[in-house]
Design a protein with these regions (language model features):
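C-terminal non-catalytic regions of proteins with extracellular/luminal or membrane-system context
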Residues: 2-169
Length: 169
């Protein structure tokens, strides 16, 4: 398994009220190593050949969210490019989204094997996420929120005051 992305070796969290420094944090890399007990290689910025040669690629991506920060609905351009490159290089791609809110996945959602929306997992949530990835547990439940397919589906669409330099593409 090739684990890639800026959050392959760290536990992401948002700012403001969602910023809680835990103890004994479990990273995506540590969680997958524990769940698989097999060869897991973590590379933040892989090249095309590394992606192509991997049996399975897991892209750990997402956004940074906090109160009083307006961010685009899109992922960071570098993260978006990594997902697209992984899809071009390999047929077995899992995208692990670690975020505090929705993102635009329309450019690649139909090109990946799976999407796991892990939100901000907390200090040990990555272990449960890894158990989902390896089939140890079957996730179920209902969300208290809606993840929009595009920003136009958001109740906030069209309500941003004129003059603000915010992109929602």
């Amino acid at each position: 398994v090739l684990l890639v992305g800026r959050w392959a070796k760290t536990v992401p969290q948002g700012g403001g009220a969602s910023c809680v420094r835990g103890f004994n944090l479990v990273t995506p890399e540590q969680a997958l190593l524990s769940a698989l007990r097999a060869n897991v290689k973590a590379v933040e910025k892989p090249n095309f050949i590394q992606l192509q040669k991997a049996d399975i690629v897991v892209v750990a991506t997402g956004t940074y969210d906090s109160e009083n920060i307006e961010r685009p609905f899109a992922m960071d351009e570098e993260d978006e490019a990594l997902v697209r490159m992984a899809c071009a290089a390999n047929k077995k791609v899992i995208v692990l989204v670690l975020s505090g809110s929705g993102i635009d996945m329309s450019a690649w959602h139909d090109k990946v094997s799976a999407i796991i929306y892990g939100w901000y997992p907390g200090q040990a949530g990555m272990q449960a996420t890894a158990d989902i990835m390896v089939g140890k547990i079957n996730p179920s439940g209902k969300l208290p929120a809606t993840i929009e397919k595009s920003f136009k589906d958001s109740p906030a669409y069209g309500m941003i005051p004129a003059g603000l330099n915010i992109s929602h593409t």
